[in-house]
Curated annotation (Swiss-Prot):
Topology in the lipid bilayer: Multi-pass membrane protein
Annotated keywords: Membrane, Transmembrane, Transmembrane helix
Recorded GO CC terms: membrane; mitochondrion
InterPro entries: AIM11
Name of the protein described by the UniProt record: Altered inheritance of mitochondria protein 11
PANTHER family: ALTERED INHERITANCE OF MITOCHONDRIA PROTEIN 11
Organism expressing this protein natively: Lodderomyces elongisporus (strain ATCC 11503 / CBS 2605 / JCM 1781 / NBRC 1676 / NRRL YB-4239) (Yeast)
Annotated TM spans: 31-49, 82-104
Similarity-based family: Belongs to the AIM11 family.
Entry's localization field: Membrane
Length: 153
């Protein structure tokens, strides 16, 4: 980010003007992922729309309108529908996922877990639970499980 850009951001009172270059690059990457999936979503839905219009059967005068023509290939139509539906579902899901990650400022699942725990109050409950006294039976059970996991038994 150039100094003139930072000056403009300071003038407009944006807090990102004081951010580190690593943070700015991270946010740019999150934004790029979101917009990539948004563009893919637009492309896939437009593709589905065009395929639907192209396959629409419009009968000529005095032709039956309740039966498709005999040259119609149901297998190919089903394959295109499954592929296009999968593409649309994947791209929209990706857009939703990366948009949420961009809004919450998370880059991986571990950060997402920490953020959700903090938003739902789980970190406070976990701290309270860790500060509680542990009785002897629970401590013995915990030590036994730790020994089992570490391979001491």
């Amino acid at each position: 980010m150039t100094s003139t850009t930072r000056d403009v951001l300071h003038k407009l009172n944006f807090s990102i003007a004081d951010a580190s270059p690593e943070y700015i690059d991270r946010r740019k990457l999150q934004m790029a992922k979101f917009f990539t999936f948004a563009a893919l979503s637009i492309f896939s839905t437009r593709f589905i729309y065009k395929q639907t219009i192209a396959r629409q059967y419009v009968p000529l005068l005095f032709q039956q309108n309740h039966q498709p023509p005999t040259s119609y290939n149901f297998t190919a139509d089903a394959m295109v529908a499954v592929g296009a539906g999968t593409l649309a579902c994947g791209s929209i899901s990706g857009m939703l996922m990366f948009g949420t990650a961009w809004i919450l400022d998370v880059s991986n699942l571990k950060e997402f877990g920490y953020r959700m725990k903090a938003l739902m109050g789980g970190d406070v409950k976990e701290k309270e639970l860790s500060e509680m006294k542990m009785d002897d039976e629970t401590r013995a059970l915990q030590d036994g499980l730790n020994d089992l996991l570490e391979g001491k038994i």
